[in-house]
C-alpha cells in the first residue's frame, strides 16, 4: 500500500522573496485560497516577526483557510516564535516552523557559534514552540553541506525536544540527487528516534536539480516535500511543486507514494500565481508551460492522432487544462456566463458576477465572441480591482505618428474630484503616464513593463503588467483591454490605487500601535 507524501507549499513565504513588488494581504489571501482548493496539506504563508504587514497577512490567512494547515516561519529566537504563535492563534490548527543553520560554514561564519550551542538552542526553541502547538517543524539550514554525523545529532535532539517534522534543506541547491538520497538514508540509519517525526525536504534549483533532489529524497524515505508553485523563489527558485506532484502521480509505479492534491486545480492555481506575482511562465516549463502539451513534429503529431499515449505521459485534462470552448456573445445572458464559469471550476466567491457580466458585455460588443480565456482574464482583473479605489480612469485620448511627438490627454477621478492633464511623451504609453503623473503629483518611476496576449489572434486581450517605484517601495499594477494603451493606463491607475491603499494601511497600523501604547500607559 502506498504512503502519502505531504505537500508543503511555501509560495507565499520563500516564493515571495523573488518578487519585485510585495504582495498585498488581499493578493496573498487569493493565492492561499487557491492553494487550499488545490489541496496542499500545509501552507507556509509568512515570517510574522519581519514586519507588521507580514503579521497581518499570516493572521488573515490563518483566520480564513480551513482545509490546509497554516504555518509561519520563525528563527530559533524567542520573539520570532512568540510572534508567530500570536499571528496563528486564530487558526483552528497551525504549525510553527523554526530553523537554525547546522553546516560548519554557517555555524562558524554566520552564527559565530559551535555545534553544541546550536543543538542547545534548537532544543530550547522547539520546546518553546511546543508550548503553543503540537505541530512543530524544525529545519537544519544548509543541511546539504552538513556532515551526516553532525546532522544526525541535531535531528535526534530536535525530535527528542518535540519536533514532529524534521526538514532537511538543500539551502543553496548544491547537492546531487544521489547525494541527497544518501543524506536521507543516512539519517534513517543513524537517528534512533527518527520514526517519531516526518522527514521533509526543501530543495533549491541553483543547479537545476530541485525536483530531482526532492524525488530522490522521497524514494529514500522522505514523506514531506516543500516547494512553490511554478518554482518561484530567490536566486534560481524553489522546487516546482506542480512538477513533483505530477511526477509522483505519473511514476507511482516506482515511487509507490501518493499525494492528496486535487490535480484538476494545478493549471488554474499555476496561472493565478503567475498573474498575481507578475512572473510569466516559460513556454517550455514542464507541466504548466504553454508548450507542455504541444506537438510540432510531423511524426509526433501523427503518433498523437493515432494514440495520445504515444507521446503524452499525461493529458492536459489531468491538470485541469480543458479544451477551449466558445460562442458566448453579447446576446448571452448572465445565466450563461455563470454556467460557463461553473463549468470551468470557478466558485461564486471567486468573482463578482455583476462586475464580470458588465465587463463581458463590453468585451463582447468589441470582439463578438468571448472565449474561456477571455472570461478567466476578466475574472482575474476584476478580483484584483475589487478593493476600494481612490483613482479611476475617466477618459484618455492619444495622438501619435511615426514622425510626430506623442501627446496624451487624460481625465482621472481622484476621490470625489475629476482632474485633467495633457502631456507629451516618448510614444503614446509614455505620454499617458506623464499626464497621469502630472495629475497625481506622485512622481512614480516605471521599473518594469510587460505585455501579454490573453487569447489568440488579432482579437486577443492585452494584459499589461507594470512595476513602479514610489518612495523606495515597488508596486505592481495590472490592466486589461483590447487596446494596449488603455491596458497600460489601467495598469498605472492600479499602481496608484495600490500606493494609496498601502498608505491607508500604514495609517491604520500606526493608529492601532498608538492605541495599544495608550492602553499600556493607562494600565
Curated annotation (Swiss-Prot):
GO terms for molecular function: 2-isopropylmalate synthase activity; acetyl-CoA C-acetyltransferase activity; manganese ion binding. Its EC number is 2.3.3.13. It catalyses: 3-methyl-2-oxobutanoate + acetyl-CoA + H2O = (2S)-2-isopropylmalate + CoA + H(+). Keywords: Amino-acid biosynthesis, Branched-chain amino acid biosynthesis, Cytoplasm, Leucine biosynthesis, Manganese, Metal-binding, Transferase. SUPFAM superfamilies: 2-isopropylmalate synthase LeuA, allosteric (dimerisation) domain, Aldolase. Mn(2+) binds at residues 14, 202, 204, 238. Residues 5-267 form the Pyruvate carboxyltransferase domain. SMART domains: LeuA_dimer. Signal peptide: none annotated. Pathway: Amino-acid biosynthesis; L-leucine biosynthesis; L-leucine from 3-methyl-2-oxobutanoate: step 1/4. It holds the Pfam family HMGL-like. Its main location: cytoplasm. GO terms for cellular component: cytosol. Catalyzes the condensation of the acetyl group of acetyl-CoA with 3-methyl-2-oxobutanoate (2-ketoisovalerate) to form 3-carboxy-3-hydroxy-4-methylpentanoate (2-isopropylmalate). This is 2-isopropylmalate synthase. It comes from Escherichia coli O6:H1 (strain CFT073 / ATCC 700928 / UPEC).
